[in-house]
């Protein structure tokens, strides 16, 4: 099978995507597929460079990659691809929309408000949410332009920074607890990982620098494990996920809260999904093979 590994892109996460793509290529080649590296530098590249491939493995992150646009183009071209479809991808990229659906489905998530203008910040609403808060681009990823703000004085500057990366900014209550991530493969949860950043939170450096955080497989207390698994599965169903996603949560006083869903989780040597799969004996090559297999089974 001729597999095109699509990477790069035009988002702020381009370098992360290129790293994912290189790792994916290295291990897919072990499976004896014909691999075509496809580096995206501009939007039109998808139409031009994807011609002639049998399957697209998406190693993209961020806008024009994780937001359903590339998925829509590939569907138009009748090229099967890895991961979730356009609708789920678009919704999960929009943190505000994701949280609205979670709230509607009675799935725990931290309180938040969104703003589109640094001059129209509702400080009373933020006060009700309670400080400290995270201020971040609504559709951003990899914690780019994400700041922990501890009082009213720091809000405007953080909002202005986030607006440089997105037209909408989320201000979300900082729920202090243990950060965990649940990797879902074909609707089943792999072992839970605890994320223990060396910084105050799991920022860009903690995510991608060697030694930026400790990510360890943990065995949750039985009752909590059941709650977490049920919540991850509810997210999968409510947001109509397919093939694989990563559900990030915070556990506070025994109660899990969903932070966000990643429809194209990172695939670098530091990535969480391969670590979780490895804990049940699934090698990186086997994981990639499963993603290709399950993706081909999805009716688009």
From Swiss-Prot:
Assigned keywords, A-Z:
ATP-binding, Cell shape, Cell wall biogenesis/degradation, Cytoplasm, Ligase, Magnesium, Manganese, Metal-binding, Nucleotide-binding, Peptidoglycan synthesis
Keyword GTP-binding assigned to the entry: answer is no
Where does the chain cross the membrane?
none
Localisation per UniProt entry: Cytoplasm
Biological processes annotated in GO: cell wall organization; peptidoglycan biosynthetic process; regulation of cell shape
Assigned GO CC terms:
cytoplasm
A Pfam short name: Dala_Dala_lig_N
**Record-linked PROSITE patterns:** ATP_GRASP (PS50975), DALA_DALA_LIGASE_1 (PS00843), DALA_DALA_LIGASE_2 (PS00844)
Residues binding Mg(2+) 1, per UniProt: 248, 260
**Residues given in the record as ATP binding sites:** 126-181
Q: Which residues form the ATP-grasp domain?
A: 99-293
What is the E.C. number? 6.3.2.4
Q: Which cofactors go with this protein?
A: Mg(2+); Mn(2+)
Pathway(s) of this molecule: Cell wall biogenesis; peptidoglycan biosynthesis
Q: Which reaction does it catalyse?
A: 2 D-alanine + ATP = D-alanyl-D-alanine + ADP + phosphate + H(+)
Residues that hold Mg(2+) 2 according to the record:
260, 262
Q: How is the cofactor bound?
A: Binds 2 magnesium or manganese ions per subunit.
One GO molecular function term of this record is: metal ion binding
Provide the primary localization: cytoplasm
Superkingdom, natural source: Bacteria
Residues in coiled coil: none
PANTHER family per record = D-ALANINE--D-ALANINE LIGASE (PTHR23132), D-ALANINE--D-ALANINE LIGASE B (PTHR23132:SF23)
- Purpose: Cell wall formation.
Give the UniProt family note: Belongs to the D-alanine--D-alanine ligase family.
Tell me the protein's name. D-alanine--D-alanine ligase
């Amino acid at each position: 099978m001729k597999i095109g590994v699509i990477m790069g892109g035009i988002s702020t996460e381009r370098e992360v995507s290129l790293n994912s793509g290189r790792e994916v290529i290295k291990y897919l080649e072990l499976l004896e597929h014909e691999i075509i590296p496809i580096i995206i530098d501009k939007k039109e590249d998808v139409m031009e460079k994807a011609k002639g491939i049998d399957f697209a493995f998406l190693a993209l992150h961020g806008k024009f990659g994780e937001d359903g646009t590339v998925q829509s183009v590939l569907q138009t071209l009748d090229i099967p691809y890895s991961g979730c479809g356009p609708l789920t991808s678009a919704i999960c990229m929009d943190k505000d929309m994701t949280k609205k659906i979670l709230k509607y489905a009675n799935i725990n998530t931290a309180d938040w408000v969104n703003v589109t203008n640094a001059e129209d910040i509702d400080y009373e609403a933020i006060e009700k949410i309670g400080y400290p808060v995270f201020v971040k681009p609504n559709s951003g990823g990899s914690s780019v332009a994400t700041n922990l703000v501890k009082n009213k004085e720091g809000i405007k500057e953080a909002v202005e920074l986030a607006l440089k990366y997105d037209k909408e900014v989320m201000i979300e209550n900082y729920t202090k607890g243990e950060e965990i991530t649940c990797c879902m493969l074909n609707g089943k949860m792999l072992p839970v990982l605890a994320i223990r950043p060396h910084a105050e939170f799991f920022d860009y450096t903690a995510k991608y620098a060697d030694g930026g955080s400790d990510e360890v497989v943990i065995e949750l207390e039985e009752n909590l494990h059941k709650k977490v698994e049920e919540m991850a599965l509810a997210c999968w169903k409510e947001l109509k996920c397919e093939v694989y996603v990563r559900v990030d949560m915070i556990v506070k006083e025994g109660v899990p809260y969903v932070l966000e869903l990643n429809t194209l989780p990172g695939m670098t040597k530091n990535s969480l999904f391969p670590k979780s799969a490895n804990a049940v004996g699934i090698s990186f090559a086997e994981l990639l093979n499963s993603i290709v297999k399950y993706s081909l089974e999805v009716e688009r």
